[in-house]
Amino acid sequence: MFNEITKSVTWNGQVLELSTGKIARQADGAVTVKMGNSVLLCTAVVANKAKEGIGFLPLTINYREMAYAAGKIPGGFFKHEGKPSDREVLVSRLIDRPIRPLFHPAFVNETHVTCSVLSYDPETPVDILAIIGASAALSLSPAPYLEIVAASKVGLINGEFVLNPTLALLKTSQLDLVVAGTSDSVMMVESEAHLLSEEQMLEAVKFGFESFQPVIKIIKELAEEAKKPKLEMQALYPASLKKEIEKLFVKEIEQAFAMKSKQERSTNLDLITEKVFTHFVSDIENKKYSHYQIESALKAIESGILRNEILEKNRRIDGRSTTDIRQIACEIGLLPSAHGSALFTRGETQSLVSTTFGTSLDEQIVDSLEGEYKERFMLNYIFPPYSVNEAMPMKAPSRREVGHGKLAWRAINPILPNKVQFPYSIRVVAETTESNGSSSMATVCGSSLALMYAGVPIKAPVAGIAMGLVKEGKNFAVLSDILGDEDYFGDMDFKVAGTGEGITALQMDIKISGVDFKIMKVALEQARLGRLHILEQMNKVISKPNNELSKNAPSTTTIKIDKDKIRDIIGPGGKVIKEICETSGAKIDISDDGTVSVYASDRDKLKVALDKIKAIVVEPEIGEIFNGTVVKVLDSGAFINYVGNKDGFVHISEVSGERIETVSSVLKQGDIVKVKLIGFDNKGKAKLTIKNADKDKFSNNTKPKTSVNNTKDNSEPEQRHDSSKKRAWNEDNNAEIAEVITERKYFN
């Protein structure tokens, strides 16, 4: 029934298996990828006819993580997979980027690739397996997929490169790098790094490139046995068409490219495009030329003009040399109500960035195959249509926005303080207000400025730069700080972010084959010099974090209590903690280990909440004096609330130094009296005395101690209760609280 074909290779100590012919047999290409306990199904479907009237490849990549793959049922009201998560979007883009440049340039058939995780093993990198599976499925399909791609993940642990590190190993790794490519070229790099040098990054890319070569071999073997006939493709456009357009319009196009303003240049190129289509309108109607052929020929002419100016004259369309950086302007604190803000402008690219502090309750909850976890740092990249002068409605975040935001997140994350140094959650919003190339790197620069102005103790300022490449044969030029047109017509988009010491993020997309490590080395060094120049300009405005937070920032502190006291603070059904929050206006977050984080809009509200928590968790010591409130009077004595929610009993003999006939003759409900704790009965109930209490040192204003460091003392039976639970506060915590509340400063 099944004609299954399987190829396998031992890769990094695990067997990687690719098979086809058993599952999804009606798809143009279908490959099952297995490694460890991970199983992915990758399919490729190609439309029979080309899509008319478009000038790009309509390729859609969908990566899906099925909940059942990890033995889970989806959360939420509807118990099924919903819209793609950010991770699914990011992996979809990761698959798309190395694959898209490898199709025949004239191919415009609708193409869909789906990669589904059916079984999940945390010991295997499923994103890498998805890239491999997608490439294999396309190699089996009729699509004119010209070369085969594979990928690998690289970590750096204890100075050694690690191939396909597990999630556990990545937590201790200085590098998380994905590299994809063909048998002779790197096509894509995506990484987060902890201040690594250019040499280390280049060696990591080489290591990853060499590591996936055995995988390319088995994909080729599978394709040789199971591939379907490829679609026959013609030239993108007739050579005669290009010659005719050049003859009629090349001078006008050259004049348009001589205009340094993006708006002016774009307007004139649009007018020329209209003229070209008007000239060929009869040819389009007679189907001599298609709309796509004319557009492609025109773009080829524009590309040739731009590339020739760079390679032959070392001159770019805005007049810069290949290494020049556009003019930079930085401004901080321009949004008075934000906790931190900055405006970063580089040429015609501009990013308005704001920073907001929140509580641990504001952290982003992420539900993934690995399990649920929280992100305390969030970065949202927004690219509104007005930034490129387009009249379009605002929509939900696009895949591009999610991807650019994650790249900026990777650049900033390594230099952030940990939660002990800075207990807030952090949200950065970067809105691209103008765009002409490298808006994601403008986001990195603006985010660094806004964070420092907000008072976040980052390790060092971070800047980012986008590099480009123009290559013809052996002749090439690496471009610093590329424009949008240079990105579109160029051969590489190479983004590098980092501090003065090293790289924190790197993303590279190459559109052609033959880009070797020599070119990458030149690009990395040129990017380093450009990054240092940008940092120099940024440092003129702000070079280190402000010592104080914004007056609009919330106050916060973190204390430690006995885990046994957690239930007392929460109360039945959350009654107690809800009452504290409502009366104080603060927010409280309690961890299972007894860590209590308190947040409020100002220090007065914070103090109210802390006092209420203190009253609940305090464990008084024998001999302490308190202001107590009489809650009930009996013939034998009285119950008195002496601290927090704790009541003690005063026997009639302890009410007064003189003999009294009745307790009610001395005490009434609601009376406030000084009481002294003299011990506990065999049930742990407090025993109090009023006699001579006002003659002893009053202890209500002393700093109570926490019950974190419990010790047991069996010297006296009456003290067993007290010795098992010391006071639930400590002076170290109080000293820290005083500093945090009054100074609101944080140090590394």
Swiss-Prot record:
Composition bias type Polar residues, residue spans: 699-712
Record's keyword terms, sorted: Cytoplasm, Magnesium, Metal-binding, Nucleotidyltransferase, RNA-binding, Transferase
Protein's GO biological process: mRNA catabolic process; RNA processing
Region: Disordered, residue numbers: 695-733
EC number: 2.7.7.8
Biased composition (Basic and acidic residues): 713-722
GO molecular function terms noted in the UniProt entry: 3'-5'-RNA exonuclease activity; magnesium ion binding; polyribonucleotide nucleotidyltransferase activity; RNA binding
Record-linked Pfam families: KH_1, PNPase, RNase_PH, RNase_PH_C, S1
Reaction catalysed by this enzyme: RNA(n+1) + phosphate = RNA(n) + a ribonucleoside 5'-diphosphate
PANTHER family, per the entry: POLYRIBONUCLEOTIDE NUCLEOTIDYLTRANSFERASE, POLYRIBONUCLEOTIDE NUCLEOTIDYLTRANSFERASE 1, MITOCHONDRIAL
Family: Belongs to the polyribonucleotide nucleotidyltransferase family.
HAMAP family per record: PNPase
Protein name per its UniProtKB record: Polyribonucleotide nucleotidyltransferase
Gene that produces this protein: pnp
